[in-house]
């Protein structure tokens, strides 16, 4: 079970955002391992 929330890390967050985008801080990319 993967946590879909992006970490507080700016780099990680940017990676998630570039991957597919996020809504209200929740990473929408299931492969994101933030």
Swiss-Prot record:
Disulfide bonds join 6-27, 12-32, 16-34. Has the structural arrangement of an alpha-helix connected to antiparallel beta-sheets by disulfide bonds. Its main location: secreted. Toxin that acts as an agonist on melanocortin receptors (MC1R, MC3R, MC5R, MC5R). After binding to MC1R, the peptide activates the hMC1R/Gs pathway, but after binding to MC4R, it is not able to activate or antagonize the MC4R/Gs pathway. Inhibits melanocyte stimulating hormone (MSH)-binding to human receptors (Ki=2.9 uM to MC1R, Ki=3.9 uM to MC3R, Ki=2.6 uM to MC4R, Ki=2.2 uM to MC5R). This toxin is structurally unrelated to the natural agonists. Expressed by the venom gland. GO terms for cellular component: extracellular region. SUPFAM superfamilies: Scorpion toxin-like. The keyword Protease does not apply. It is found in: Secreted. This is NU-buthitoxin-Ptr1a. Keywords: Disulfide bond, G-protein coupled receptor impairing toxin, Secreted, Toxin. One of its GO terms (molecular function) is toxin activity. Negative results: does not show activity when tested at 100 uM on mammalian sodium channels (Nav1.1, Nav1.2, Nav1.3, Nav1.4, Nav1.5, Nav1.6, Nav1.7, and Nav1.8), potassium channels (Kv1.1, Kv1.2, Kv1.3, Kv1.4, Kv1.5, Kv1.6, Kv2.1, Kv3.1, Kv4.3, Kv7.1, Kv7.3, Kv10.1, Kv11.1(hERG), GIRK1), a calcium channel (Cav3.3), and nicotinic acetylcholine receceptors alpha1-beta-1-gamma-delta and nAChR alpha-7. The letter 'N' in the name stands for the Greek letter 'nu' that has been chosen as the activity descriptor for melanocortin receptor modulators. Since it is impossible to search for Greek letters in databases, the UniProt policy is to write all Greek letters as their full names (i.e. alpha, beta, etc.). It comes from Parabuthus transvaalicus.
């Amino acid at each position: 079970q993967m946590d879909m929330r992006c970490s507080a890390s700016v780099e990680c967050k940017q990676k998630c955002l570039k991957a597919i985008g996020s809504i209200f801080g929740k990473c929408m990319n299931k492969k994101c391992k933030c």
